Regions:
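Active-site/substrate-binding loop(s) of hydrolase catalytic cores
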Residues: 1-98, 121
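Active-site-adjacent mobile loop/cap segments within catalytic or ligand-binding domains
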Residues: 24, 75, 101-150
Length: 150
């Protein structure tokens, strides 16, 4: 479990790291683009390298990512059934957003074939307590964790 992939972005309340790079566009994938905002090279950012190294070391059967604010369960790679099981346990619909350039979803789901779902939580959760978030989304999260992999 990696509680925060972008600690600098969390503190600054932005999706970009200290170098101004969107880490969720910095992974090696056929659809990746070399730009200042996505990184001038794949895995140019230490945070993305850490995630890749963790994937190499632990070889996860499934990846569960939590984002905001698109209000859905997205998936990449062989994860459609998992996404549907998760959505049955919360108020978020399954919505295939497509493989974003150099995203963790593109890398894990399409390049490595690891099922990945993304809880895209609603954007209006600023005043929701942790207890209420857990009450609202724990059944879905637990369903994802319990889902039979491979």
């Amino acid at each position: 479990m990696l509680p925060v992939a972008n600690p600098d972005g969390l503190i600054a309340e932005t999706r970009f790291n200290t170098h101004g790079v969107d880490l969720n566009r910095n992974f090696p994938a056929a659809n990746r683009q070399n730009t200042a905002r996505f990184g001038l090279a794949e895995l140019s950012e230490p945070e993305a390298v850490v995630i890749k190294d963790l994937m190499d070391k632990y070889e996860p059967d499934v990846i569960i990512s939590i984002h905001q604010p698109l209000n859905c369960i997205d998936y990449d790679g062989p994860a459609e059934d998992l996404a549907r099981v998760v959505a049955e346990n919360c108020d978020l619909p399954v919505r295939k957003l497509g493989a974003m350039p150099g995203s963790l979803g593109s890398y894990s789901g399409l390049v490595r074939g690891i099922p990945i779902i993304t809880f895209e939580l609603p954007g209006d959760l600023g005043r929701v307590s942790r207890d209420e978030l857990w009450e609202r989304y724990s059944p879905a999260l637990l369903a994802a964790i319990a889902y039979p992999a491979k």
